[in-house]
């Protein structure tokens, strides 16, 4: 679940032999290709780009030749190129598109705006048509690194749709006359928002391999909007169950606040700044903060009836929140792919190295001979951090549904246990 990126990757794969280590880091030196011709070192290339940046910022741009041979303009450091009044495209977009017609790309063949997780090296799509993107759901053009992300939430959407259409209407909570209509509506809306969230995630992971940057950006906004709906619905169900019998005005106040904050987050989702890699902590904080609003209802339950009813919120913790918490750890730390040892990774820093991170590289990263299971060569295609995040999200959503059912039984069906 992520996007037009403007971050400076600090760790990257090197496609040539490594120079002697300096302060525990590796640097790239001059390479030779298979025919013996010398390649420019990454450091030299980075310095050239740094000079381009300096001239571009000082002089407002630099004349370049486009892929078609026509003059164009290189804009600033990000390197977008406009040719003969055509739509502005990121630097190296044409090369990536040409290669993407025939095969999947490695990380360094992608234009900079398409680079997300620097530890996922192989299997990147760069498709020119919507049809190819849609068919990639079925791996029509080979297994890619979004296959399991797509199918994990396709399965999740199917599970939640089953619960919405079959499991929930046949539950004892749904059929019980004691359970207020508002609580039933909130639980049903939660399941519907869960289906919407999973479908939005599937749409994003299906089309994040398109070569059309504007379309790609729209689909990531769709994904974030689905997440916002799910989190907001989770808070509303918690508030409806915990506060309905204690303070109706307080319940409505928290529901309005939750929906208002969710709406604000939904609007923010469509900001291009929200999608940038450096905004990852902000994204996590927004969703965690929105979810935490639901825990405030527990505080009011405790203030009203003290610890006698503290067990009311327990199912929410051990059936749902624990799964979300584990998933956030994988999402934020990029584990396990950051531990892969099947390719040579750099850990250097500094302006020259940061400039080198933007380069388009013809050669793939150096593959080591270590292809054992523990080298984690398989993380490009299976069991990477984002897939694990997807799995724990599905567990968290299903767990939340089971938790609010149990909480509803405590409040309305098991007379005298809650209050």
Curated annotation (Swiss-Prot):
Belongs to the ADIPOR family. Residues 169-184, 247-249, 305-311, 399-419 are cytoplasmic. It is a multi-pass membrane protein. The chain crosses the membrane at residues 148-168, 185-205, 226-246, 250-270, 284-304, 312-332, 378-398. Pfam families: HlyIII. GO terms for cellular component: endoplasmic reticulum membrane. This is ADIPOR-like receptor IZH3. It is found in: Endoplasmic reticulum membrane. Residues 1-65 are annotated as: Disordered. GO terms for molecular function: signaling receptor activity. Glycans are attached at residues 145, 208. It comes from the Eukaryota. Residues 1-147, 206-225, 271-283, 333-377 are lumenal. Disulfide bonds: none annotated.
